[in-house]
Amino acid sequence: MTHFSQQDNFSVAARVLGALFYYAPESAEAAPLVAVLTRDGWETQWPLPEASLAPLVTAFQTQSEETHAQAWQRLFVGPWALPSPPWGSVWLDRESVLFGDSTLALRQWMREKGIQFEMKQNEPEDHFGSLLLMAAWLAENGRQTECEELLAWHLFPWSTRFLDVFIEKAEHPFYRALGELARLTLAQWQSQLLIPVAVKPLFR
């Protein structure tokens, strides 16, 4: 049985997407990735057909009056309400709260699997970016079954809706393109999963 997450390009793509959603664009983790995506050539290395990526190459390079840092602040930090909150429990919990039941279920799963993952201070573990970084770490450490459980049970049940809203409301060419790249890539991964994706009701 071969897991798609055993492929080298899985962990690279998961780490790139995770870092760009989780870290500020000027951070040491994300700045080199922003530089790569705003130049030609990255699409030849991405694990999707180049034809499907061609519009994104142009979009990533499109200029905007709003800087990348300003857009990231608006989309992921605030102070105003975030247009598409990146935490799973906001979508999966009836009250749309942080640290909801779905976050607790993720924590329980992590404990059962012996997974320790360092988060920013007092932030829920179910951030879209951190879940991708965790998936990359699991894949890199040969834990393919846990990687695919994480995706099927704790990310894919809400990520499509999150990305649809994120793309619709991003209002910045780089982050709209990033949302599109994530949506295409996660759809490809989901089509290759060996276990079914959990069906969970969404509340926004």
UniProtKB/Swiss-Prot annotation:
Species of the source: Escherichia coli O6:H1 (strain CFT073 / ATCC 700928 / UPEC)
UniProtKB keywords: Chaperone
Superkingdom assignment: Bacteria
InterPro entries in the record: DmsD-type (IPR026269), DmsD_chaperone (IPR028611), DMSO/NO3_reduct_chaperone (IPR020945), TorD-like_sf (IPR036411), TorD/DmsD_chaperones (IPR050289)
Name of one Pfam family that matches: Nitrate_red_del
MF GO annotations: signal sequence binding
Gene Ontology terms describing biological process: chaperone-mediated protein folding
Keyword Chaperone: yes
Role summary: Required for biogenesis/assembly of DMSO reductase, but not for the interaction of the DmsA signal peptide with the Tat system. May be part of a chaperone cascade complex that facilitates a folding-maturation pathway for the substrate protein.
Encoding gene per record: dmsD
UniProt name for this protein: Tat proofreading chaperone DmsD
Similarity section: Belongs to the TorD/DmsD family. DmsD subfamily.
